[in-house]
Amino acid sequence: MRTLFLAAFSLSLISAPVSAEIKAGPGLDYAKLAFYPKRWKEKKIDTIMFPWEGKEIAFLTITDGFDPKVMTQFVGSLDQGWSTYLKFTGKAPRLNRQVNGKPVIAAIPDGNLSCGAGCGYVGATGIEANYFYSSTYKNLQKNPKTIPHLYFYEMGRNFFTFGRKHSCYTTGFAVFMRYVCIDTLNVVDNDKRTRETINKAIEIYSKGELNFLKTFTNAHGLSEKQNRLQTSPTDQPVMYASAMLHLWKLLGDEWLSSYYKNIHTLPSFADNTREGARSQSLGWYLAASVAAQKDLAEIFVKEWRFPLSNEEKQTLSYINWKEEGLDAGKLMEKLFKK
């Protein structure tokens, strides 16, 4: 008999003793956790789901009949992805959709119940993922390291906690960080062509003439989904991801953690105006430089054509990038006082 436990947007179950192998917990009513509960009701789809609790997240399925060994490995990989985000960003999302205090990732039975292949709250916990029953689980049975991009991408939606300090790059952040997870966890990337295209994009851009703000923001004539180069995909989020992958490979893990720490120190700006988009882009450059403890103008200004004014160049020329306590927010304040 199914046992139901329901409470607003969080659900609490009687926790089983910790063991090496994960087993599904008692059924719970997902209706209060669903992103679009009316759609479930209209389609007359049962909202009972079963949680597979890991150390970091709870993965929900419509049946508890899956192989515990396969599910243990899969949930373990999702745990590692979540931990990777925590390690680098240094800040957890606001707890929203949860089971026993753990962020929920729900395997929905129909993509029309949500917003597509995957859906995630921005800055708060809660992910819905499609295709688990039709393909993902079958692939996991063959190779437990075959984790679809969408899980790590949607975690990036949850972990975008920067607000308008960096909102020009909300989607680009998720695209970039999914590859950080894939590389860090050494899982299988079944779309190598897309990864190769993204890796090459920043080098191709560097050799071209398209300006920085038109390439990396949406406030200078091109929409988010328009390709910036002749190859595809090279839309705005991809270009940011390509640039960040280049910086990460060049500067390393400690740099990336420091980079996000510095992003949090920045002031907020509108992302839909030319001035605001430029200010957010300036913050990107400064945060990257402070994290590197050196001026990255050679990359951002010379190679990527960021429009740094002569006055800004002069001010930054006097900065001791290794100064203790220096952060990107303080530099922005210094530049805006000029």
PLM region descriptions:
Residues 23-24, 273-338:
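Beta/coil-rich, acidic/histidine-enriched accessory regions frequently appended to metallopeptidases
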